[in-house]
């Protein structure tokens, strides 16, 4: 169980909450989180890179010059990989980079990654009422009041999509906004700080607590 201090819009401590998630054993934690991270990054690859071999490049059917008597090196095609405009040797072809991982393992890795970042977790009260209309400057100021340095990367987790928060956060280069149901290992590990609303923490407990 991880105890968390709750901060309000002004950055003052107003209460406490707890996050209780089942995590991997200490000896297996790094391995399972690493596997989940590799899977996520591999599955994000399009795998559409493609090159043409000498057999696929247009042209090159006629022998450029006779085999002997010219003094030049022998050549059978002007689409040889040695020639400019020729085919590519061992170039990439479309392939599937995806890595499979069991559902229960993925969930365990996600919970483990989140708990491992508990020292960087900031829990705040719901602030949607503080932003009746999109205001990037006000959100940036609030994030600073919560203890985040200007150039630190922030993962902002909310319970549900709210347009005013989304529009306020999208122009802050160091802030990434996601919903509690869209948690992923890469974002959790990549951020310097994880800021979650109390409602988002409850949603995380509800969705991933099993």
Curated annotation (Swiss-Prot):
GO terms for molecular function: rRNA binding; structural constituent of ribosome. Gene3D superfamilies: 3.40.1370.10. The keyword Ribonucleoprotein applies. GO terms for cellular component: ribonucleoprotein complex; ribosome. One of its GO terms (biological process) is translation. Residues 41-79 are annotated as: Disordered. Signal peptide: none annotated. Residues 60-71 have a biased composition (Basic residues). It holds the Pfam family Ribosomal_L4. Residues 43-52 have a biased composition (Polar residues). Keywords: Ribonucleoprotein, Ribosomal protein, RNA-binding, rRNA-binding. NCBIfam families: rplD_bact. Part of the 50S ribosomal subunit. Belongs to the universal ribosomal protein uL4 family. This is Large ribosomal subunit protein uL4. It comes from Cyanothece sp. (strain PCC 7425 / ATCC 29141). The gene is rplD.
